[in-house]
């Protein structure tokens, strides 16, 4: 599991930062990539990475401002020409269906794969045997959502050495034991599978938040997260400006991570006014509140290990 940032700027494309998009790479977990937001030229950014559009399974749109959305029709269309045949689901606020369907219809774009569009509200918006995704509305003056991706706990490892000490040889019986079943050996020995399986492996939590002021919903989404991706459009000194434009400062983001008990914070959605030393100062401001903070740049990747 890793995060790969495709666009980390705010508002409009800039020379050093494209507009918003981040990929959650789940290649080992499910052979898929999930995108969060799809600003203009996201598919151009993808060309400079190892991401394969045909592996994009879900796209989550935080809100309908253009810098988070305008790259979506092009990416959906291009996926058809890049061997994309598996279904893809777009999740987003009310209006996302009209936007996508109109763009595809007016441009005469025909998709070779099944496209599902889900207009979301708060709550669980996706759930399967491995992951769930929870959405909550943030404070941005228009419907803007944050997403909490929860990896479900994995079964503990089979304690092979203990089984071998009892003379239990590898075979189909190992699978039964790993499932916690009670099995009877050829010599009549009864084995309780639960005693030969280690503790469950704790699933990881990733919170990806859309544009927002500081708010309690952001804290709830980030609670105990392994990684929080939070906008930091403005420096701490621009608190009034951030509030007026429904955005966050560096210290707003850091305070969310601190109150949530998160492990790690990654800042994104950075105004183009902050370059070079000014950008480094943003990190310093956030670290004064939440030390384990990093600043995303385009094409930066962050591994998310277990534990």
From Swiss-Prot:
SUPFAM superfamilies: Metallo-hydrolase/oxidoreductase
List of catalytic residues: 67
Top-level taxon of origin: Bacteria
Names of required cofactors: Zn(2+)
GO molecular function, one term: zinc ion binding
Residues reported to bind Zn(2+) 2: 67-68, 211, 269
Pfam families found in the cross-reference section: Lactamase_B, Lactamase_B_2
InterPro entries (UniProt xref): Metallo-B-lactamas, RibonucZ/Hydroxyglut_hydro, RNase_Z/BN
E.C. number: 3.1.26.11
Residues the record lists as binding Zn(2+) 1: 63, 65, 140, 211
Enzyme class at the top of the EC tree: hydrolase
The entry's keywords: Endonuclease, Hydrolase, Metal-binding, Nuclease, tRNA processing, Zinc
Comment on bound cofactor: Binds 2 Zn(2+) ions.
Function text: Zinc phosphodiesterase, which displays some tRNA 3'-processing endonuclease activity. Probably involved in tRNA maturation, by removing a 3'-trailer from precursor tRNA.
Subunit structure: Homodimer.
Family: Belongs to the RNase Z family.
PANTHER family: ZINC PHOSPHODIESTERASE ELAC PROTEIN 1 (PTHR46018:SF2)
Protein name: Ribonuclease Z
């Amino acid at each position: 599991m890793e995060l790969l940032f495709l666009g980390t700027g705010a508002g409009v494309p800039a020379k050093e930062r494209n507009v918003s998009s981040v990929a959650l790479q789940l290649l080992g977990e499910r052979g898929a990539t999930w995108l969060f937001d799809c600003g203009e030229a996201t598919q151009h950014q993808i060309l400079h990475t190892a991401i394969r559009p045909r592996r994009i399974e879900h796209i989550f749109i935080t809100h309908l401002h253009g810098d988070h959305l305008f790259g979506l029709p092009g990416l959906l269309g291009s996926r058809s020409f890049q061997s994309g045949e598996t279904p893809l689901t777009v999740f987003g606020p009310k209006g996302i269906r009209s936007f996508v369907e109109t763009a595809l219809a007016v441009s005469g774009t025909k998709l070779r794969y099944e496209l599902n569009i889900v207009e979301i509200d708060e709550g669980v918006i996706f759930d399967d045997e491995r992951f769930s995704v929870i959405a909550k509305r943030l404070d941005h003056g228009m419907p803007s959502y944050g997403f909490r991706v929860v990896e479900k706990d994995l079964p503990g490892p089979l304690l092979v050495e203990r089984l071998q000490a009892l003379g239990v040889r590898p075979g189909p019986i190992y699978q039964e034991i790993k499932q916690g079943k009670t099995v009877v050996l050829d010599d009549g020995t009864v084995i309780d599978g639960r005693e030969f399986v280690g503790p469950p492996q704790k699933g990881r939590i990733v919170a990806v938040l859309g544009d927002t002021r500081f708010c309690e919903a952001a804290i709830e989404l980030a609670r105990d997260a392994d990684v929080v991706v939070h906008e930091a459009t403005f420096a701490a000194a621009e608190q009034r400006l951030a509030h007026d434009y429904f955005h966050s400062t560096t210290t707003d983001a850091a305070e969310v991570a601190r109150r949530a008990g998160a492990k790690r914070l990654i800042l994104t959605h950075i105004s183009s006014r902050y370059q070079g030393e000014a950008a480094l100062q943003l990190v310093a401001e956030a670290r004064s509140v939440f030390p384990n903070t990093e600043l995303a740049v385009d094409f930066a990747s962050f591994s998310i290990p277990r534990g």
